[in-house]
Regions:
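Short, cationic-aromatic polyanion-contact patches
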Residues: 4-10, 62-80
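Pre-recognition alpha-helix immediately N-terminal to the DNA-recognition helix
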Residues: 12-17
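Short helix-to-turn junction characteristic of helix-turn-helix DNA-binding domains
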Residues: 18-22
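Short acidic, hydrophobic short linear motifs in intrinsically disordered regions
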Residues: 23-33
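Short, hydrophobic-biased segments on the C-terminal half of alpha helices
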Residues: 45-49
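Amphipathic alpha-helical dimerization/coiled-coil segments
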Residues: 76-120
Length: 120
């Protein structure tokens, strides 16, 4: 998959339609996109083709399925954000995030558990 995963909101909504219904026939995808996004068939196929070219989905034998899970996509998006915005420094990200939003004790405990698990 290409590194560039920057997407517009409509692409993301389209991806959610697929993730929530996969694997699905491309004709069913057109129906779902008409209902959920008010898209016409050509729009659905154009966006699908573009996201297939980016290695996120595949259309094989008329069936559409993801090549990466929603969780993997989120992980890659988060990693790219930290890399581009904070030069890859997770501590810098957490410092910036924590300075604007007060973390609850529960959130701090959860973060500490993640850090402790990474040390093992």
């Amino acid at each position: 998959m290409k590194k560039d995963l920057k997407l517009c909101e409509s692409d993301y909504r389209f991806m959610c339609v697929i993730w929530e219904n996969e694997p699905l026939p491309s004709g069913k995808l057109v129906e779902l996109c008409k209902e959920a996004l008010d898209w016409k068939k050509p729009t659905t196929y154009t966006v699908l083709r573009r996201l297939c070219e980016r290695g996120i989905f595949q259309k094989e034998g008329g069936t559409v399925r993801s090549l990466i899970s929603r969780e993997e996509f989120y992980a890659r998006q988060s990693e790219m954000f930290v890399e581009e915005t904070f030069h890859g420094s997770l501590p810098a990200f957490l410092t910036a995030f924590g300075s604007r939003k007060k973390l609850s004790d529960t959130e701090i405990d959860e973060l500490q558990k993640v850090i402790d698990a990474m040390r093992r």
